[in-house]
């Protein structure tokens, strides 16, 4: 059965005023990748490119999305993997949809395409969002940097991670969008003061998840001596004990871990009072 494009039962929507895109075959040599918002090509990316090239079919090749820039070049918004694969196969031109937009809109388009299709990692989306000056991304970056840490816009291997590097982008974003940027700054500041051995593992999701969500439970927590809380009981010990309780009582790990830190923070507040 063949169906037409039928939308007569839906209310029409008027799109934003914008120039119509152009369709063309663009020389691969004129396509460039803007590292301000595009993801870098690591080993996994190159493996994917080689797989596309090894079984290249035009029937599977969606036109790349480009924006014209100075010098007669085209910034690649979406499709750098396909473009690289075509180059490996010796094709000098690729089909493209060309849209005239600013660099900020290029970055926003990258975020939209890769967020809706779930192809980019959270750090990669953050990188593009910062380039596009998206408010949420700037707020996330600033909340982390205010604590002397760095919100990472690309992944690293475990061996290459350093103390103060925060990869928990989704956690930070959720807290910031929930009005808890203060908790991100307070929690990370305490970790930096507590960590006198530059332990990268302290800034992993394993620790940051329960710790930052615990700090965020109450604005009063920011007034407590959070450094003393961390020094009073090793964070790993807190999490391990919480996991045992969760197993015995059949409770969710995330909630039990968070509540364990909440109890320690509140107890520190009572002692200080």
Regions found by a protein language model. Give the residues of each.
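Short alpha-helix boundary/capping and kink motifs at helix termini
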Residues: 2-77, 81-88, 92, 97-100
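Solvent-exposed functional surfaces
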Residues: 91-273
